[in-house]
Amino acid sequence: MTAPITLPPPTRQALCPYAVLAVLAMCWPAISLAEDEYTFPLGPEHTPTKLQMSHAMAHPPTYIAANPTIQPSPTTIRMTYESLSLPAGEKMGMLGGDLLINVNDHLRLGVGTYGALTGERGGFITLGVEGELQQRINQAWLSHAGLFVGAGGGRGGYTLSGGGLMLRGDMGITYESKSYGNIGFGVSHVRFPSGIITSTQPYIQYEYPFNILLASGWADTPSLDSQIRLDPVQASANEFALVGRNYQFSASALRDDGKPQSSSMQLVGVEWLSYLNDRWFVKVESEGAMGGENNGYMQILLGGGYRLPITRSTSLKMHATAGPAGGGGADTGGGLLLDAGLGLQQNMSKNMALELSLGAVTAPSHSFEALSLGLKLNYQFGLPNVTSTAVSWNALGDFDTEQLRMRLANQTYFKADPNWRNRSINQEVSNLGVQVDYFISPHWFMTGQGLAAYAGDAGAYMTGEVGLGTHWDLSKSWFIEGEGLVGAAGGGGLAVGGGLVAQANASLGYRLSDALSIMATAGYIEAPQGDFKANVAGISLAYQLTGFTAK
């Protein structure tokens, strides 16, 4: 016998958990819609689109036993700060950022990054994967122990980080507040096995918990009972953008060795926004140098802003961000970079927009200062705003399922040009990172990857690329793929010129289960503006997921 259940009121807007997966959710617009035919993607009144119930559905829903559901996954965005002890009494303040998903009540897995924020090592940045065990002490307190395995380096990275492998273990406790997130503290130990950094220090951290709706594997929509009324699920507004920037430096800007800074630098990267309400948003962005004389420069900025509608399809956006930045000889001091600016966004279709931004960036502790001109291609979409309560498939009729895939990847570079690097020219370079794929059809996918060197005497080398791939099944278990990518790379003594790189890969994959696959890859990467040319051999572990976006 069924019983009516009254749903709780909608909770606060959850931050978008697809900071990594959203890099693949875009396509070029086909046409520009006329003003009188245009429906603004965030709603005609410039508010985030919400899934509305009809008048007949305005009462709490009734469930039956056969109603299939999806259990949302508890997820956390975590920020950590600690100060590492370097040789000769030097200190390096590091800011960490992690995205963690609960596998069960005791285990969390995710991806993360650490970047220098204070000291004299601006641009020292690492990327990697994170695992954490946790045990509840009481209703408000948790104990935890974690391990981060990553790769990277930066200013002085060759000496400090060696090949680039970073290991970080930590133990601590966390206090869970009901309304303001979680506060934690503990002790961590950081080691670069092939470098000279070995440091134990206290840390503090802040966590923002929320829930995301993902299904393991590529789930098919089950058969649904049309008599079951829909849950009042809402869609939260989000944006993802491909970004191109030009920095025009001030006359007083210098390089970190005291020599004059070149007049400009070009960057490429990605940006993700999540709206807290109809006007305010938070955002994170990451870019790397691909032109100029600062190859190896990278920035990861976090902040927020305000969107002011001008017409139904035009908006003015204001933002302010801060985060770690540096490398490539840029004089960012300890690494803290501040950025503020204005943007004019023009929608060209229901989901696509172009944005022109103008701003200023500065490193408060040193001479790095520039005007920033940016061009962005935005993709706008809605995600289910859910709590910890199981969600009925019947509630998702106004959402499309999206096929997603995350790959934990190892790629090794082998010399294809005698001048491909400035030291250890006969030694291969091994890289660790994450690749994310968004399937736009059964045979085509958008892809993005972020990799950093962990072995091969190339500590501080990093690359971030986006591109297009194709997938074809050979049998039920075997498949082949091809992909082409372009992006930015630098550091570690690899001769990438201004930083622009292009890569092509071919892969053979085997399905271990409905969700898990293993892939072997062969490819080629080169820098059009430099002597860097390398053959690529890789292996990756791929996990398939189903996500949901508003129709």
Where do the PLM segments sit?
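Transmembrane beta-strands of outer-membrane beta-barrel pores
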Residues: 81-87, 113-119, 149-155, 187-193, ...
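Outer-membrane beta-barrel "beta-signal"
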Residues: 38-40, 198-225, 239-249, 369-393, ...
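Gram-negative (and chloroplast) outer-membrane scaffold detector with strong preference
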Residues: 98-157, 271-330, 433-501, 548
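N-terminal signal peptide c-region/cleavage motif recognized by signal peptidases
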Residues: 27-29
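Solvent-exposed loop/turn segments connecting transmembrane beta-strands
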Residues: 84-95, 116-127, 137, 155-165, ...
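Repeated loop/turn-to-beta-strand initiation elements of outer-membrane beta-barrel proteins
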Residues: 75, 105-111, 139-143, 175-185, ...
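Hydrophobic, lipid-facing positions within transmembrane beta-strands of outer-membrane proteins
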Residues: 75-77, 93-97, 113, 125-131, ...
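Transmembrane beta-strand segments of Gram-negative outer membrane beta-barrel proteins
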Residues: 65-83, 107-109, 143-147, 230-250, ...
